[in-house]
Amino acid sequence: MFKPVDFSETSPVPPDIDLAPTQSPHHVAPSQDSSYDLLSRSSDDKIDAEKGPHDELSKHLPLFQKRPLSDTPISSNWNSPGITEENTPSDSPENSATNLKSLHRLHINDETQLKNAKIPTNDTTDYMPPSDGANEVTRIDLKDIKSPTRHHKRRPTTIDVPGLTKSKTSPDGLISKEDSGSKLVIVMVGLPATGKSFITNKLSRFLNYSLYYCKVFNVGNTRRKFAKEHGLKDQDSKFFEPKNADSTRLRDKWAMDTLDELLDYLLEGSGSVGIFDATNTSRERRKNVLARIRKRSPHLKVLFLESVCSDHALVQKNIRLKLFGPDYKGKDPESSLKDFKSRLANYLKAYEPIEDDENLQYIKMIDVGKKVIAYNIQGFLASQTVYYLLNFNLADRQIWITRSGESEDNVSGRIGGNSHLTPRGLRFAKSLPKFIARQREIFYQNLMQQKKNNENTDGNIYNDFFVWTSMRARTIGTAQYFNEDDYPIKQMKMLDELSAGDYDGMTYPEIKNNFPEEFEKRQKDKLRYRYPGIGGESYMDVINRLRPVITELERIEDNVLIITHRVVARALLGYFMNLSMGIIANLDVPLHCVYCLEPKPYGITWSLWEYDEASDSFSKVPQTDLNTTRVKEVGLVYNERRYSVIPTAPPSARSSFASDFLSRKRSNPTSASSSQSELSEQPKNSVSAQTGSNNTTLIGSNFNIKNENGDSRIPLSAPLMATNTSNNILDGGGTSISIHRPRVVPNQNNVNPLLANNNKAASNVPNVKKSAATPRQIFEIDKVDEKLSMLKNKSFLLHGKDYPNNADNNDNEDIRAKTMNRSQSHV
């Protein structure tokens, strides 16, 4: 950058290229204006020697330019205008903002006007004319100033955004354990059946997706656990009578015990946000909660979130859902309904809504987002919470997610790029509008049926249908056959694929061979790894730029089709399924398949539709043919285990064979057609169908394990296995449940063993009609399946042989050659 100078010799003449455009080379004859400087140079040698080497170096540097040549050229039309609506003076040195004192003298002539003048804050607020004693030195006793190092170590810091900020205490942008001032406690307030659990689950899901680790701490769970351990009888409505001193004392104890668990999670654990889920309907309770928090930490931010529901129909719907909750599970519905209404009346006696004179930071949601009141909001996380809560709705809608049709880069195996569709991709693009139009019609018919059945459907039930694409040519080409009058199309930069930076256009083998160290870094931590070069991104970068898309999806009441790319589709599916970041990077999003998501009050239901090139149609893949894994959801109620069924790539994902489902469909078109018809016409919102399996082996994950760096917030390795033998979709949340247990297969082709379940093993199990099977028979069948799977795993580990697969051996070779592998994908 700087040239070394030998001060013992005469400085060499620098070449012309090293000089600024405004300078002249030393060997060029000086102008008349500079002759005096040359004549007096010898007389100033002594002074120059005293100035030191820095001044000597400055003689050979280009002139400093406040606006370098890399800035916008002077001739640009985008310079600041000389005259604005406020009649700003021209930008000469005399009239610029650096000479504000002269501007005041031009407009204000006498002392009276000067005293009474109102100066605009955006122009001269920071300017103060010097006083008569401006030249006097004011001495300040430094002992009276508190040094920053003397503050408490848990002082709040500025904004932390995972993946976008970096500091000494937070190298990855996550809120550090020591920075308790940036953490948030959300205290729920409201009567039962007003939507508090719905709000907390959605809010927790959004915060965890944003990598602000959040958990819900439910006082009701503490009450039930205490009653079970101490043999207390069931708490009926009389237990919640405000005048019952004994029960009130117990309920206060349970509340404080739960709050202590929350504070331990924030102050001693890795949590950033803790949600205290309780009624907290009295001023006294809220005062005690705030005092307990301040006793543990004076720096934690506290936000009270009150849910008010004035919609009688919505309250009645929530009450019916409560009958399936843990307090009334397995009891007589009629007596349970009567008891819960009596409990609600007791809570209403002591209910005191939050008021401004309590001097709390609070949000009041009325009818689950129809009206939102925010008061005294402080802190970054609190403001993000308000922003998210403004985008709630309960409308029935569908969210369709698919990748672009097959592109030229998909065929060559190159990542990134902006290639166009292949002929096969164009066929998919032409068939997609017809499929979506049919599904839109079926969805509308189901809404009409709900209205006839008086299922609290709004008057205007006809949904618009939007199509969103990225700005890459392959997604735009996939949407080109949609009629924009019926399907408004919008291109979004946020939906672009993860940028590979310098590696854009390369294949994975090329990256591995040419940059083995970078390839290994990404294999170890795909979530945090950012591709080198300008524009290179990581999964965390994609997650951050998708936040506006997430909030818009939560806000709109219409259906939408998102045509995007693999990483973006993974991130969107991970949000709606409430998955850990370590799981998102392994979701299966094959080409020419469409995911359908339907938000529900208790979670999300999803299905997968696969394009059959031979018949030029789409078919819904039965759950028995899906490669799925059950994984534990994150950020929900503390000490509760909830699971989502997620799509995962099969061991044969890298093969060139067609999917088993399409192969069987071609071999037996009659049964496949009837199956498709039944799937298309079956009613939506069928709770009985979603809760059909209560004896299912679950494959979950323990998200509290620590990685090699001792950090338990983002696991770097695959999750652990966990099992559970009971599940209720209304109680447990999550996605729709398959009535068949996923089969676990050994690690093959470098596929994560937890995320590669082979359902083909089900073909070796006798087919039992579910309608004729009793719960006991289903339980026995699951036991046999589990033992069979264990024996096959053991056989593979001992002999190193793959499972026999007759279906693949019987496939037609012509079909293999013509059919694209639906899991062919990159990035």
From Swiss-Prot:
Phosphorylation results in the activation of the kinase activity. Residues 31-41, 671-682 have a biased composition (Low complexity). Keywords: ATP-binding, Kinase, Nucleotide-binding, Phosphoprotein, Transferase. Beta-D-fructose 6-phosphate binds at residue 343. Residues 72-97, 683-704 have a biased composition (Polar residues). Residues 1-97, 149-175, 649-704, 799-827 are annotated as: Disordered. It catalyses: beta-D-fructose 6-phosphate + ATP = beta-D-fructose 2,6-bisphosphate + ADP + H(+). It comes from the Eukaryota. InterPro entries: 6Pfruct_kin, 6Phosfructo_kin, His_Pase_superF_clade-1, His_PPase_superfam, P-loop_NTPase. GO terms for molecular function: 6-phosphofructo-2-kinase activity; ATP binding. GO terms for biological process: fructose 2,6-bisphosphate metabolic process; fructose metabolic process. Gene3D superfamilies: P-loop containing nucleotide triphosphate hydrolases (3.40.50.300), Phosphoglycerate mutase-like (3.40.50.1240). Pfam families: 6PF2K, His_Phos_1. Residues 42-59 have a biased composition (Basic and acidic residues). One of its GO terms (cellular component) is cytosol. Present with 1710 molecules/cell in log phase SD medium. Synthesis of fructose 2,6-bisphosphate. This is 6-phosphofructo-2-kinase 1. It comes from Saccharomyces cerevisiae (strain ATCC 204508 / S288c). The gene is PFK26.
